[in-house]
Each structure stands twice: as C-alpha cells, then as structure tokens.
Amino acid sequence: MLYPRALLPAAVALASLVLAVPLEERQLAFDFNNQKVRGVNLGGWFVLEPWITPSIFQQWANGGDVIDEYSYTAALGKDEAFTRLNNHWATWITEEDFAEIASMGLNHVRIPIGYWALVAIPNDPYVQGQLSYVDRAIDWARKNGLKVMLDLHGAPGSQNGFDNSGRTGTIAWQSGDNVPNTLRAIQALAERYAPQTDVVTAIELLNEPANWGNDLSQIKKFYYDGWGNVRTQGQTAVTIHDAFLDPRSWNGFMNSEAGVNNVILDTHIYQVFSQNEVAMKPCAHVQTACSSIDKIKPTDKWTIVGEWTGAQTDCAKWLNGLGKGARYDGTLPGHSEGYYGSCDKKYEGTVDSMLPVDKTNLQYFVEAQLDAYESHTGWFFWTWKTESAPEWHFQNLTRAGLIPQPLDSRKVPSQCGTSQCLVPGN
C-alpha cells in the first residue's frame, strides 16, 4: 500500500475508518502493556550469517567471493543452493527447539526472513522454499504456547550493507523498485501470517535500516506504507526499527496521536562493534547496559530490545565478516590500533570451555541487561543457537546456568540500582 507523503495523514485516517480501528491500542493475543516480551531470535535459519553457521561457508574460508547468502547462492547455482539450504532449514531449528525455548520461560520467538522468501525478483540468485518451514514454526509455536514476531530481515538492494541483510556492500534499498518490492514482501507476509492472531503477535517491517546511506524521511514513509499493508489483514502489531537512532527520537512518530495503533519500536543494543566498546572493562559494560534504561523507558510506544547478547568482545569467528578477525585482539583489518585481550576460548568453542572469569563476567552482564530491558516492553536475545560462538548461544548459556532460571531470578539483584561495581575482581 503506497501513499504519497503529502497524503499520509489522510491515508492513515482512511485506513482507520475502513477497518473501524480506534486510535487506542486494540486488544491483542499478547498484552504488551502488562506482560514482558521474553524471547529469542532464531538467527541463521532463513537468513544466513557466516558467524552463526560457519560450516555452511567453510569451503570459502581461505578466500573467494562468497561472504553472504547472495554470493553463496550465486556461487552454487539455484539447484545446488536449494539442496543445501533445504537441508539446513530442515535441521537447524526443529520442534524440539521450540519445546526447549518454552521450557526456559520464554514467551516469544523472533524469526528473521529475507524478502526473497516472499517475492522473487528477476536475476536474483536466491532460492525459495522457506515458507513451508515458517508454517511449521508457527505450528510449533502454537503447540508450545509461544508467540511469534516475524521480522523482514533483508530488503532488496540491502537496507544496511551488512551480511545479515542477505547482501554485503552498498546500501541501495531506496533505489529503483526496491522499496515497492519490499512492500510487496510485507503484503505477502501479512496476508499469509497476520490472520494467525493466536500466535503471530507482530510483524517487523524491516530489520536495521541504516540512517546513513538512506533518506530517513523515506524510511518513515515506508513505515507508514508497511503499517497500512499489515492493517489490510487486521490488527497485528507492527514493529519498526529505530534505524540506529536514539529511541527517544521516535517519540511523536506513529503513536496514537499520529493516527496509528499497535506499533512497537525495536532498538538493538550491542557493545562489541566499536573500538571504544571492546576496550571497556566488565563493570563499564554493566553500567552501559543499565544506562540504556534512560533511552528506552521514556519512549511513547511499546519498546523492545529486539537484539542483544552476552558477548563483551567481537571475538566470535567471522562475526565481523567471513575471514575477518576482531577488534578485541587487533586482528580486524583497519582496526589494529588496539589490543585489549586474547580471543582464546571466545573465537570458537563451547560454553563449557569458556574461562571461568569470562563466565562470571557474562553472567553479571546478562542479568544487568535483563533488568534494563524489562524497564519497558521486553527483549529478544540474539541468538537461540550458534555452531561455535558460545557467548551468543542462549540455549547453551541457559543450560550452563549463566542465564538465570527462572528468568526473573538474580544472582546479583539490582545491579542497575547502584553506582558500585559488583562484578568480582573489577
């Protein structure tokens, strides 16, 4: 549903009139006002990321042009790519995962999906077939009492140039027909899944559109248009990402006074993707997590931290891109000016093999983040599982006792209520 910018207020009013939607939030299957979202991302399932599943990319570990799902499918060709990916889709996440997710006290999963699963664009190398597995995921969630947020994780042209958009490099999302094709994908996603209101509580219009390389006014117009697309199918909540801006800067946009309803703001909080962040000591990581309360609590719409992690370094194998090193130990090209520690036991391995001090630091960090992010609507940890990145592996961190069970228990209560450093040895 495309609206000329000048007609946005009228279009929103018309959509509300046609659907008989009052401006206040309608009752949904999940009470975002009074319940906390506690969820995990099912990363690496339908949008490949080399660091989550390095085995899929291992044949190009020593060089080559394959660095993301676009180049992966282009290199293999559609037939071979489908064979390999279909096996991956069938095995990476199963019904047993959903059962364990529910057993850990979580109530949501966030499922990243690329546009290519929904809309085929000529000359794209991507393959289709993901939706039958998404259908299964919805059924598994229903069976296990879980809710689902569907997340359009990759847009044509790439909305951020990251490998997690499907294609690394230039940001070209707002060129040509890319935005209209993204809206086609949203429409297809909404038509297929929004009616399943007992399970699908929200549709995220686009993951991490960059505020650089894109026109912010066009991002905002896209959000209105995408909201209109979802509203043709009912009252499912619509999630918008903050485009890496201060969440408070979105106050007044797409709230009830603006004539829209059921909008969730998504912010992602990592402390590993800059030199200054990886240089921080464990106490500084905790304090930074707690300081996020001041940014998310004053927002005027439901606000979730849709991605966060236990990692305090960027050591995980290929986290910065296939074949690339880390800022933390000075091995990332162009970021060799500092050395803050060894990536031993952090580059790859298991939670059990982590150093005791790293386990302790992670446990304190995770508990502080849980306290901070539940100051508003809730959170989704990134990610449920990885092949070899222990600090990012919710399943194994929880099994090892480093993420609390139940989720509201604390080894160290009220870390965000004191200015003192409570992390041992710091």
Curated annotation (Swiss-Prot):
Q: What EC numbers are recorded for this enzyme?
A: 3.2.1.58
* Taxonomy, superkingdom: Eukaryota
Q: Return the InterPro entries for the record.
A: Glyco_hydro_5, Glycoside_hydrolase_SF, Glycosyl_hydrolase_5
Name its GO BP terms in alphabetical order.
Answer: cell wall organization; glucan catabolic process
Keywords of this entry: Cell wall biogenesis/degradation, Disulfide bond, Glycosidase, Hydrolase, Secreted, Signal, Zymogen
- What are its GO cellular component terms? cell surface; extracellular region
- Catalytic function, reaction form: Successive hydrolysis of beta-D-glucose units from the non-reducing ends of (1->3)-beta-D-glucans, releasing alpha-glucose
GO molecular function per UniProt: glucan exo-1,3-beta-glucosidase activity
Listed as disulfide-bonded, the cysteine pairs are 290-416, 315-343
Functionally, this protein is described as follows: Beta-glucanases participate in the metabolism of beta-glucan, the main structural component of the cell wall. It could also function biosynthetically as a transglycosylase.
* Protein family: Belongs to the glycosyl hydrolase 5 (cellulase A) family.
Q: What is this protein called?
A: Glucan 1,3-beta-glucosidase
Supply the source organism for this entry.
Blumeria graminis (Powdery mildew)
